[in-house]
Amino acid sequence: MILAFTEDGSVFVFTKQEDACREFEGIDVENGVVTFYDDAGTPLRPDFIEPNQQGRSFFIRWVVSGKYRLVRDPYTEQDPFWLALHESSHLEPNSEFEILDDLKRHVAAKGAVVDPPDSSD
């Protein structure tokens, strides 16, 4: 299962990686508009098979979105899963979960940290 978090606070749930990669353009992924995790809370980084292309022709800027796959990367610099979940406000309709709390329970059962670390230490 792939979880995609967008900068507007939405969470998308995909059962197949291909569906997640098809939903979000490579240029947006490269620019951090969306970040991905698996349902155990492990970050997924984009591995570009075909790079994004950008250029200018006179005064017109053009962009061709590249193709990518998602690779597990627990050492990436993206936000920890609990923070991405905490900043989310909307779960997009999907076949797995009705509300964000359902998603939170599912990933917690798989071992993901879903709450902020205790800062009282």
Predicted regions mapped to residue ranges:
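Long, charge-rich C-terminal accessory regions
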Residues: 24-26
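Low-complexity intrinsically disordered segments
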Residues: 30-121
